[in-house]
């Protein structure tokens, strides 16, 4: 293709990809399968690599993430990003309303969900995104333009050539947060405490490729100077932003009076667990800009807005002890052992203590009355100590200096907060590697859970993953609660795992920094273990989302004689070393019932796991999301389906039972 043809085709591709991205990330209603989007993206990347001068500021390829930055520049906000005064009860809201009415008379309000994320400012010139910044101290923030470009719901070009500055909240959805922490746990990295910290940490990465891998989202909630654009009210501004192509939260309401505001607050206090993202309250703003101007602001916050904060569900219980565990990468993690207590609807007996620094900073002692909450309503964590309840019997805790399993000296590597055991033959690490290898996300060996692995390990029957493939029935039946039938089933599951596709084996090997998603990308790209073993650092970094740190870890792994020996053993036992999945560019069957549809899974499926069902739907061109909305096309309901099924029925969305679901995926295999 000559340059003129390339220029025309690049323009076509940009228009298509920007439209498809808007449908997918903003409207939540994709019109093409993911595979088609990926194919077009790869075509545009190839053109821009051949003709770099054709790359434009609104090109969707800008979302992949550019080279790492040396530091963040400071950005002065043209209009200050003020914080809001807080309200903690109905009385505070009525006091706010009374002050408003005293100044400007009756006023209508706009209520919006207060997203628990990171406030950002985004600036556009002639319709093009030119700069993004954090809130900082309200007058000066940090330039995070390159990281914000990686958020797919943020338009790089608006639908009109206007110049404006919008304000919004970048956040990490619950599903992305759980997935990220699972991947970090698999890599032996410290877990994020909550989705807000994860979002903030992602946007403050100097390497935009890291931000691109984190699946962040963004709602825009206002304009820095809306009246200059001829807009008279906040509700009009939100509608205008939405019309320009921004993602604006649909869960908002214009309220005629404070009673309607209080009803909205009460409604979302009960409904917030159903949301796919975290909120920590409701923002209430006077709707009229003329009234806002009349009310003015204090030095810290506007008088025309207030943030109602939901009370965090925190409970107090006793810290019985602190358990120290060694993970498969050698990271030593302290866990609080608690008197059982109910938090956010579940009984909690264990909670994260993060690391040694956290325990020291909070001065947490065994026997303390400690405050527990669920971080982002997801992970139980100790957030503080009730010092007034100390009676002198509490015991300060010190992290061990030697590994509790192998007694090797623990070390803290440069730049890390965690202590590590560096002994590669540490029994705890060997055991955890076996558990990881057999896990559902890796080799998926049914029946080979933590208890069975521990028995096998303690009996001296296995030391590394290759040993699993030479186990015999006679060895297994000697284990506790392992009869002949159970032994036969386990051996069959081990045998079946030999046929897994490469990405499962690759993830199961536990290479540092290589989570399930990276393993999938590597397997798709290299197709065989042999090619991956021979890959150079540069070839690895050519794979989307594989950065320098991961590439270094992969090359270091394959350079170890122990890794070479292990792979030779696995080959000898007949373990598959090739990628069996569809190429990302593959088309879904034309007659697929899932092609281009947004699907929600709810309840328990008898025939397969949730992840397996998701894989089947995506293989057939569908997209799986975590919550039911008007843009959902189909809900698949298993046993004990709950609120998602009810919402689907209310919205008139098509619902399938498991039998119909199996019918369709089996038809798609023909």
From Swiss-Prot:
Positions that bind Zn(2+): 403, 406, 421, 426
BRCT domain span: 589-670
Enzyme kind, highest EC tier: ligase
GO-annotated biological processes: DNA repair; DNA replication
Catalysed reaction, written as an equation: NAD(+) + (deoxyribonucleotide)n-3'-hydroxyl + 5'-phospho-(deoxyribonucleotide)m = (deoxyribonucleotide)n+m + AMP + beta-nicotinamide D-nucleotide
One Pfam family in the UniProt entry: HHH_2
Keywords of the record: DNA damage, DNA repair, DNA replication, Ligase, Magnesium, Manganese, Metal-binding, NAD, Zinc
Enzyme Commission designation: 6.5.1.2
Coiled-coil blocks: none
Cofactor: Mg(2+); Mn(2+)
GO cellular component entries: cytosol
Keyword Cytoplasm on entry: no
GO molecular function, one term: DNA ligase (NAD+) activity
InterPro entries per the UniProt record, alphabetical: BRCT_dom, BRCT_dom_sf, DisA/LigA_HHH, DNA_ligase, DNA_ligase_AS, DNA_ligase_CS, DNAligase_adenylation, DNAligase_N
Chain sites annotated for binding NAD(+): 34-38, 83-84, 112, 135, 169, 285, 309
Active site: 114
The keyword Chloroplast is annotated on this UniProt entry: no
Family designation: Belongs to the NAD-dependent DNA ligase family. LigA subfamily.
Function: DNA ligase that catalyzes the formation of phosphodiester linkages between 5'-phosphoryl and 3'-hydroxyl groups in double-stranded DNA using NAD as a coenzyme and as the energy source for the reaction. It is essential for DNA replication and repair of damaged DNA.
Protein name: DNA ligase
Source species taxonomy: Bacteria, Bacillati, Bacillota, Bacilli, Bacillales
């Amino acid at each position: 293709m000559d340059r003129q043809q390339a220029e025309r085709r690049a323009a076509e591709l940009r228009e298509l990809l920007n439209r498809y991205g808007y449908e997918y990330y903003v409207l939540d209603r994709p019109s093409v399968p993911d595979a088609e989007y990926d194919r077009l993206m790869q075509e545009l990347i190839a053109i821009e690599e051949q003709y770099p001068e054709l790359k434009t500021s609104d090109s969707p390829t800008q979302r992949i993430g550019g080279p790492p930055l040396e530091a963040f520049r400071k950005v002065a906000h043209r209009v200050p990003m003020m914080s809001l005064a807080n309200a903690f009860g109905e009385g505070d809201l009525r006091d706010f309303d009374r002050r408003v009415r005293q100044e400007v008379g009756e006023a209508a309000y706009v209520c919006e969900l207060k997203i628990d994320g990171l406030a950002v400012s985004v600036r556009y010139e002639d319709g093009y995104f030119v700069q993004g910044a954090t809130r900082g101290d309200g007058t000066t923030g940090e330039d995070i333009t390159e990281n914000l470009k990686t958020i797919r719901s943020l338009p790089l070009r608006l639908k009109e050539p206007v110049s404006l500055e919008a304000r919004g909240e970048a956040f990490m959805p619950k599903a992305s947060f759980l997935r990220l922490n699972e991947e970090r746990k698999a890599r032996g990295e410290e877990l994020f405490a909550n989705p807000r910290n994860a979002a903030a940490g992602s946007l403050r990465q100097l390497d935009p490729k890291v931000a691109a891998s984190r699946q962040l989202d963004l709602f825009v909630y206002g304009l820095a100077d809306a009246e200059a654009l001829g807009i008279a009210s906040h509700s009009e501004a939100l509608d205008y932003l939405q019309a320009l192509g921004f993602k604006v939260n649909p869960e908002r309401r214009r309220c005629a009076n404070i009673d309607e505001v209080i009803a909205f607050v009460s409604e979302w206090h009960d409904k917030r667990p159903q949301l796919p993202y975290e909120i920590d309250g409701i923002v209430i703003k006077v709707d009229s800009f003329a009234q806002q101007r009349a009310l003015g602001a204090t030095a810290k916050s506007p008088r025309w807005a207030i943030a109602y904060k939901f009370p965090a569900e925190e409970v107090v219980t006793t810290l019985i002890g602190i358990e120290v565990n060694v993970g498969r990468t050698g990271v030593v993690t302290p866990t609080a052992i608690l008197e059982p207590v109910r938090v956010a609807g579940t009984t909690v007996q264990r909670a994260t203590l993060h690391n040694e620094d956290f325990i020291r900073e909070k001065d947490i002692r065994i026997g303390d009355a400690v405050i527990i909450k669920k971080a982002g309503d997801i992970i139980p964590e100790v957030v503080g100590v009730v010092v007034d309840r100390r009676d002198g019997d509490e015991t300060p805790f010190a992290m061990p200096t030697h590994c509790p399993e192998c007694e090797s000296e623990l070390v803290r590597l440069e730049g890390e907060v965690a202590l590590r055991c560096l002994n590669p033959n540490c029994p705890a690490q060997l055991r955890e590697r076996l558990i990881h290898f057999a896990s559902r996300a890796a080799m998926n060996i049914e029946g080979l859970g933590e208890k069975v692995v521990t028995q096998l390990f303690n009996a001296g029957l296995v030391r590394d993953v290759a040993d699993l493939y030479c186990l015999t029935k006679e060895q297994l039946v000697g284990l506790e609660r392992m009869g002949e039938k159970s032994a036969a089933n386990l051996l069959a599951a081990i045998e079946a795992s030999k046929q897994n596709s490469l990405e499962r084996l690759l993830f199961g090997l536990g290479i540092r920094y290589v989570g399930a998603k990276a393993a999938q990308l590597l397997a798709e790209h290299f197709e065989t273990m042999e090619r991956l073993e021979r890959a150079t650092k540069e070839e690895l970094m050519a794979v989307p989302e594989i950065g320098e740190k991961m590439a270094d870890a992969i090359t270091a792994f394959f350079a170890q004689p122990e890794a070479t020996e292990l792979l030779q053993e696995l080959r000898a036992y007949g373990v598959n070393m090739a990628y069996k999945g569809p190429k990302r560019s593959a088309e879904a069957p034309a007659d697929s019932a899932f092609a281009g549809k947004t699907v929600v899974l709810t309840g328990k499926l008898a025939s397969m796991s949730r992840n397996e069902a998701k894989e089947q739907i995506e293989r057939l061109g569908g997209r799986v999301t975590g919550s039911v909305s008007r843009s959902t096309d189909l809900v698949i309901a298993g046993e004990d389906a709950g609120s998602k099924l009810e919402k689907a029925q209310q919205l008139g969305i098509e619902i399938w039972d498991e039998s119909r679901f199996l019918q369709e995926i089996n038809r798609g295999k023909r």
